[in-house]
């Protein structure tokens, strides 16, 4: 018996996800800072959705539109107060489709 093997890339699976953006009400906010903490800076590398990036002034910004709500940023930064994280309002956020 032969089993067909299909190679599906992670990016292709993630593309199946859908996002309902709550315009003007992001569920993640980065607290104002002069210089990012080590953990906040780490989010620019470890966020699987790449929601965090450095701006021209060297500060970390978040664009929560593609957030997968995995909680990585909560584990790294919420206790220190670097970010403010809330669940999206009902009907908004990520809709996983593992097609």
Curated annotation (Swiss-Prot):
* A Pfam family reported for this protein in Swiss-Prot or TrEMBL: Fer4_ETF_QO
Q: Which keywords describe this protein according to UniProt?
A: Electron transport, Iron, Iron-sulfur, Metal-binding, Nitrogen fixation, Transport
Recorded hits in InterPro entries, A to Z, give: 4Fe4S_Fe-S-bd, 4Fe4S_Fe_S_CS, ETF-QO/FixX_C, Fd_FixX
Q: Per the database record, which ranges form the 4Fe-4S ferredoxin-type domain?
A: 58-88
**Where does the signal peptide begin and end?**
none
Annotated Gene3D superfamilies: 3.30.70.20
Q: Which family does it belong to?
A: To ferredoxins from P.putida and C.tartarivorum, ferredoxin I from A.vinelandii, ferredoxin II from D.desulfuricans.
Outline what the protein does: Could be a 3Fe-4S cluster-containing protein.
User: What name is this protein filed under?
Assistant: Ferredoxin-like protein
In its UniProt entry, the species of origin is given as: Rhizobium leguminosarum bv. phaseoli
């Amino acid at each position: 018996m032969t089993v067909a093997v299909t190679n599906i890339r992670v990016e292709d699976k993630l593309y199946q996800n859908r996002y309902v953006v709550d315009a003007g009400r992001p569920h993640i906010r980065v607290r104002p800072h002069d210089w990012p903490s080590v953990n906040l800076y780490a989010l620019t590398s470890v966020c699987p959705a790449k929601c965090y990036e450095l701006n021209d002034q060297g500060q970390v910004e978040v664009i929560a539109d593609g957030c997968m709500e995995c909680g990585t940023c909560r584990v790294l930064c919420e206790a220190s107060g670097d970010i403010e994280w809330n669940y999206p309002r009902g009907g908004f956020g990520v809709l996983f489709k593992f097609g």
